[in-house]
Design a protein with these regions (language model features):
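Pre-Walker A-like glycine/lysine-rich segment at the N-terminus of P-loop NTPase domains
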Residues: 1-48, 59-69
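Glycine-rich phosphate-binding loops of NTPases
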Residues: 57-88, 92-141
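Internal alpha/beta loop-helix hairpins
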Residues: 53-55
Length: 141
């Protein structure tokens, strides 16, 4: 079993990011402030108990989208407004892998296949209230 692709949307510097993971070795190399740490941070936030997202975790474009909703008397949220962070793993497996942890996700019995695991952090109306409070604090900084 092997992760072959990682995709991230709307997390810090990673607006629409994907990386193909090589068979032997994959290196994440780049200049400062290009998203290397953000990639590891989003994986950690979704896969560990450190899943405390804040306004600062959302991509700057998403923060601007939220800021555009601001009115003089508060923030008005349209019903179709989507505010989320997304992480996706593509995992290839074959008949030699132990599939116990993935068996409920497998839809066919072919020997070579791919399973896609997606994680999404999105805000429901109650969470929007907390986000608005964070946003007011963010705006005052």
């Amino acid at each position: 079993m092997k992760i072959t692709k990682i995709k991230v949307e709307n997390f810090r510097l990673l607006k629409d990011f994907s990386i193909d993971v090589e068979n032997k070795l994959s290196l994440i190399i780049g200049k400062n402030n290009t998203g290397k740490t953000s990639l590891l941070a989003v994986i950690e936030k979704f896969l560990t108990e450190k899943s405390n997202f804040s306004i600062h975790d959302f991509n700057l474009d998403e923060q601007e989208k939220l800021k555009a909703l601001e009115k003089k008397e508060g923030i008005s949220i349209p019903e179709d407004f989507k505010f989320s962070i997304y992480l996706l793993f593509e995992i290839k497996y074959d008949d030699t892998d132990n599939l116990r942890n993935l068996s409920s996700l497998i839809l066919n019995l072919e020997s070579e296949n791919t399973v896609v695991l997606g994680f999404e952090y999105y805000l429901n109306p109650i969470q929007f209230k907390y986000l608005i409070d964070d946003f007011v604090e963010f705006k005052s900084e």
